[in-house]
Amino acid sequence: MEATRMLLDANPKTDAILYSADVMAVGGVHYMNDHGISIPGEIAVIGFNNSTSACECYPPLTSIDNNGELCGQLAVQMMLRLISHQPVDDERVPCELIKRATTEGKL
């Protein structure tokens, strides 16, 4: 919440914030709610991970789902290949924007 306060104090015309994790975004949403900042009216908010906290906060948090289960599966496969001295290819994991109320009318 302190980071959100500092950001908004330094940049009062901010109209959107993308947080690197849902837990940080939820803290930011709490700060904005406590200080009368309208979400998404004044500021749109997006988190990252699509955790359960994204659905539980108010308003519900728009989040980027980074497909964590697939990331874990690929990581294990890569480690096993490395252990057996086999080449490892780069992998791209698709992400999905899960739109919820914190960006309503903005995206």
Per-region residue spans from a language model:
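Flexible loop/turn connectors
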Residues: 5-6, 10-107
